[in-house]
Amino acid sequence: MALKHMQIFLFVAIFSSFCFSITLSRPLDNELIMQKRHIEWMTKHGRVYADVKEENNRYVVFKNNVERIEHLNSIPAGRTFKLAVNQFADLTNDEFRSMYTGFKGVSALSSQSQTKMSPFRYQNVSSGALPVSVDWRKKGAVTPIKNQGSCGCCWAFSAVAAIEGATQIKKGKLISLSEQQLVDCDTNDFGCEGGLMDTAFEHIKATGGLTTESNYPYKGEDATCNSKKTNPKATSITGYEDVPVNDEQALMKAVAHQPVSVGIEGGGFDFQFYSSGVFTGECTTYLDHAVTAIGYGESTNGSKYWIIKNSWGTKWGESGYMRIQKDVKDKQGLCGLAMKASYPTI
């Protein structure tokens, strides 16, 4: 009898030890899998760190971001968009915001309230006459997605994209224009430290226009203005107009006629890792980024959206673009996209 009890005791002890070892191994296995994912991500995005300490620190950030992305994507209902582990996955949200935005929105809005409102040429366009959907890519008025890198000159990319579109609509030629010319030569803005599309339009009008991207290529950093490279001019503008503030219907009228530069709050976590679908994520109306509205439409489930062209490369979003919810309850628009919009005139 004693022998039988001893056998039972040994079996329980061995089984308990086995279960305990499995329990311990699971977190270890998960950690190894995550480390492998980080290494694969580094290879995919060409990320090289200065030393082991930096790599370890970036791994922790990467892990936290991945876990949060996967948690948010697992929410079963109410989310019409997905997030992805993209090229920004080893950056904290604060780091991302400081490196990849650059719209001087707060100062722009405060000064706008003190100035006379500009004319709006589409004011009398009947809403009923507007097309149900617009996509300027299909009409040949949008150049391929560009990448501002870690230079905070989104304002320049937004302004240039709007001018590229207006030029194609007016002259029938789609020309890739120079953002670097604005970064280097527009002294009313701040290069990689940020700027505003309206002041960029003013600079372009005053200096006679923009040259091509190939003539004055993008470097992703501030440099001295090379006046020789600013010529010959590929296009010019007569000025710009602001879209009435906090009015998505007015914005729709403008976008139906041409691509429009738009200020937006693009520094949030959901925006950082947006991958696909109609964006309805968390954001504020503190404008910190600039994009270009190039269309609008409605998905098969009835979700209305804007199409925006970003300047973070093709690995972000829907090959560099985002569909973001349109006609929301808040008059400012989702992420404030109806607060500060403007377009060039040719």
Swiss-Prot record:
SMART domains from the UniProt entry: Inhibitor_I29, Pept_C1
Use case: Good molecular marker for age-induced senescence onset measurement.
Disulphide-bridged cysteine pairs: 151-192, 185-225, 283-335
Oxidoreductase in keyword set: no
Keyword Iron-sulfur on entry: no
Induction behaviour: Expression activated by developmentally controlled senescence pathways leading to programmed cell death (PCD), probably by epigenetic regulation via histone H3 deacetylation and by WRKY53 activation. Strongly up-regulated upon abscisic acid treatment. Repressed by cytokinin, auxin (IAA), and sugars (sucrose, glucose and fructose) which can thus repress developmental senescence. The senescence-associated accumulation is salicylic acid- (SA) dependent. Induced slightly in outer leaves by UV-B exposure. Expressed in late stages of heavy-metal- (e.g.
GO annotation (BP), single: stress response to copper ion
Tissue note: Found in senescent leaves, especially in senescence-associated vacuoles- (SAVs) containing cells (e.g. mesophyll and guard cells), and in senescencing ovules of unfertilised pistils.
Key words of the record: Apoptosis, Disulfide bond, Glycoprotein, Hydrolase, Hypersensitive response, Plant defense, Protease, Signal, Thiol protease, Vacuole
Annotated glycosylation sites: 124, 301
Top-level EC class as recorded in UniProt: hydrolase
One Pfam family per UniProt: Peptidase_C1
Signal peptide: 1-25
Listed GO CC annotations: senescence-associated vacuole
An example Gene Ontology molecular-function term: cysteine-type peptidase activity
Subcellular localization: Vacuole
Active site: 154, 289, 310
Phenotype when the gene is knocked out: No visible effect on senescence.
Family: Belongs to the peptidase C1 family.
Described purpose of this protein according to its UniProt entry: Cysteine protease that may have a developmental senescence specific cell death function during apoptosis, heavy metal detoxification, and hypersensitive response.
Protein name: Senescence-specific cysteine protease SAG12
Protein encoded by which gene: SAG12
